[in-house]
Each structure stands twice: as C-alpha cells, then as structure tokens.
Amino acid sequence: MDKFIAAVVAEEEHKHQIEESYEASGEVDDAGRDDMDDGDDYNSRNLIGEGLKEPIQIRFVDKFDTIEEGIDGGGVTKEFLTSITNEAFSASNGLEALFIENDQHLLYPNPAALEERKATLQQALIKEHSQTWNESTRDLLRRYEFLGRIIGKCLYEGILVDIHFAPFFLLKWALTGGSGSGTKESGYRANLNDLRDLDEGLYQGLLQLKNYSGNVEDFSLNFAVTDTIRTSPTTTNQITRELRPGGSDMPVTNENRLVYISFMARYRLQQQPYHQTNAFLRGLGMIISTSWLSMFNQSELQTLVGGSSTEISVEDLRSNTQYGGLYTIGDDGMEHPSVSLFWKVMQSLDDADRKKVLKFVTSTPRAPLLGFGNLNPRFSIRDSGSDQTRLPSTSTCVNLLKLPVYRDEKVLRERLLYSVNAGAGFNLS
C-alpha cells in the first residue's frame, strides 16, 4: 500500500505542476503565535483556496509584534499547519467547538455546531435570515471549509499531524465524489454500526431496542428527537426535530422499530452534521482530488493523516540520519562517542518517549509512511558545544537535533527527556 500511496501523491503533484505552468511567488502569511485560532486571523486565512497547493511562506510574530528570525525552509510552514490543527481540532474549545470526540477520543464535526450558532443568534435577538444572521452562519461553515483545506494541505505536502478521526467521518472522505454522490458531496449512507463511533450509549440503546423481546411501546418512544443546545456557557435550549413528518405523534412499535433505528442513524450521522461535513469536504476537495480520496479506506486515510501507528524503529531512524559539525562521520566510518550514547539512549526509551523525541526534532511524533528514508529533510544531528549543563535544542525547519557533546549516558538521557517534555516551540537560537 505504501508504494501505491507514494505513486498517487507523486501523480497528484505532477498534475498540479502541469496545470500551474506560470511561476508562482508563493503565499506569505504573518502568524501570531498566541492567536492561532483568533477570529480575525482565522477569517483572513479563509480566503486561501486553491492557492494552498502552492508553497507558502510563514513568518511567526511574537506577542510584541516582532517577526521571529529564520527562513521558512518548510519547518516553519509545518509548525504553522500543525499549530492550527492542534488548536482547531481541540475538543475543548468551549462553546463553539468545531470538532468533538467520542469515547475513544476520535474526532468528528460537532453535529450541533450550526444549531448552537443559530440559537446564540436568536438569543441575541438577531432576525432569522437577516444579513447578520446569514453572514454569521456562513462564517461558521467557512471555518469548516478552511479546516478541510488545511488537512488537504497537510496531505498534499506529506505533513503528518497528530489527529485521529472517527472511522465513519473518514468513510465520508472516501465516498466523496464516488458513485451516486453529487459534486463535493459524500455518497456515505448511515447505518447502525457506524453509530458506535459516534455515540456508544445511543448505539447500545438502539441495539437493545432492536433485540427487545417485549412490547417496545413500553419505552414511550416516537419518531422525534430532542437535543439540548448550548446558547452560552451557562444556558441551554431544547430543540425537537421530527425524524419524519408527523413523527411526534407516531409511536415506535415492534413493527416499525427497524425503521425508527434507520431514521435515527440517518439523522445523527448524516442530517444533523450535513452542512458542517459538506463544508469540510468541500475544502478538502479544493486541495486533494476526490477521486484520489476514493482510492483509500478509512484506515488508510487515517494513516495518510497521522502516519503509521507502528512503533518507532530506532534502526531505521539511525540508518537514515545525517551528521554535521564535530559529529560528521569520517573515513573510518565510526560514530562520535556522543552520537553512540544518543542512540543507546534512544534504544532504551519506550515508544512513547521515542515519539516525543521525534516530535521534538521534526514536529511530528510518527514516522513517514515509507520510513525515515522519506523524511525530507533527513533527520540530522550536529554538536552544540561541550557544556554538560546545556540542553539539547532543535531546528525543526531542517529536522536538526543540536546535541551537546555529552560524555555520560545518564546525563544525556536526563537532558534529552527534560528538553523533550518542556514543550519548546520553534527556535533557531
């Protein structure tokens, strides 16, 4: 599968190069580190569409409005994209979380996001379908579209992000533009099994209803569903939707319970999140061809997004590492003693800490799909002085670990893990 994926990506890039025969200067964006998810900053980036296929140059601006030093050799762009995804796909973003997670911490579009936005507007006495109302709801959907483009950009550039999507949501990607679906529309059809990835409690309840041997009218169900919609951190509204016309007056019986289960699955998985999902898929399709997405199943798409879930191979990483400065390997082919200590420490770490080290250096915790030989630029190590109290540092733009000339394995391990767990940002110093 890996070689096939690589071939498809190469073909997509070649196709784009042919289509874009003119010379592009590339998009330049100044990004505030502390305002990655700020409304105005977010909206300005919503204007970026097909242009995201072009190289973009990012300059980080600190809280003093000072542009950070450093040339974007790919690493700054990579940090920019991963920072956006870390913020925007967080399930703890308060009242208007765009994505929420299930019990397995897998993400999918917040089904209630649009209803919550409308309820908030109603509470503010904004007239329905007024210019303010329409612009506010469109703004929400533009955010979903923007995130679709960001994920598409990550896929297009081969940038892995530490995000895990729910399988039913990934299946919608795979079926976008497929047989029986319209342009930019998913051919996905809801089923009871997919509900398990959305709401385990609802899935179990409907399963019990399906297999109930008594009279299901004892549950007093009808063909309607009531949701609690947040209008502020402390207030909520109750909204009832009929699953079919006249559903509020239609009881669920032994005879129609399978129809009820089907309608409930369709409402929760398709109808309620319809606009949010389609906006995301529209943005994704601006960067990645829908025919390309349809080649992969859910598991393969997740691998493309987040990388291989297998353990980090120290041997593979070591054999594909470049060295500089004092650590340059000479004609004798021997590693510097400090480098040998580093690899000894890496071998002793568990997989979780190995991934932390990898993220510290490359900004992503997973290996490329085809192994570290396909990491671009290569993982590299160079010396950074002989002070034993100095901590390792990195330049993520070139996947470079700056490793002091440590002489003791214990010291190296302690200093490395301290740096890794400190959560340092991009820094060229």
Regions found by a protein language model. Name each.
Residues 1-170, 174-194:
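Hydrophobic, conserved cores of late-appearing folded domains
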Residues 36, 169-429:
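C-terminal catalytic/scaffold cores in eukaryotic proteins
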